[in-house]
Amino acid sequence: MRVLVQAEPFEFGAEAQTFADGAAGAGAIVTFTGLVRDLSGALEAMEIEHYPGMTERAIAAIAEEARQRWHLIDALVIHRHGRLGPSEPIMMVATAAAHRAEAFAAAEFLMDYLKSRAPFWKKEVTAGGADWVAAKEADEAALGRW
């Protein structure tokens, strides 16, 4: 199981291949890559802050919970911080399990956690200024199903 919190870009195809190569015995692998969205057409950047050490521990704990709950063979979580532009990869989740239902459920669980509870603070930067991103009710509701 790997948890990476990094400023550097990652290549999701290469990460997925490396993950698959190490998932011996898996019957299913699910990967998800999230991108910085520009819903308004005015986003210049997304600035993401975190508390080093605490963030990695929190994500590792939830990844371990997913591993035990869905009997995962392996899991990978990558989340970037720093200044990211529109359409840049911001995070990746990969899960490997004996069966697809477990791999999909664990991946969704991890994505819901990252979206609503992981200790990241996001600020949208536009030509008009910068605003902190507030948690969305839909994200909290998604996490509530677990």
Swiss-Prot record:
Pathway note: Cofactor biosynthesis; molybdopterin biosynthesis
E.C. numbers: 2.8.1.12
GO molecular function, one term: molybdopterin synthase activity
GO BP of this protein: Mo-molybdopterin cofactor biosynthetic process
Pfam family, one: MoaE
Substrates-to-products reaction catalysed: 2 [molybdopterin-synthase sulfur-carrier protein]-C-terminal-Gly-aminoethanethioate + cyclic pyranopterin phosphate + H2O = molybdopterin + 2 [molybdopterin-synthase sulfur-carrier protein]-C-terminal Gly-Gly + 2 H(+)
Residues given in the record as substrate binding sites: L35, V36, R37, H99, R100, K115, K122, K123, E124
Keywords: Molybdenum cofactor biosynthesis, Transferase
Superkingdom: Bacteria
Family, similarity comment: Belongs to the MoaE family.
Record text on subunit structure and interactions: Heterotetramer of 2 MoaD subunits and 2 MoaE subunits. Also stable as homodimer. The enzyme changes between these two forms during catalysis.
Role noted for this protein: Converts molybdopterin precursor Z into molybdopterin. This requires the incorporation of two sulfur atoms into precursor Z to generate a dithiolene group. The sulfur is provided by MoaD.
Protein name: Molybdopterin synthase catalytic subunit
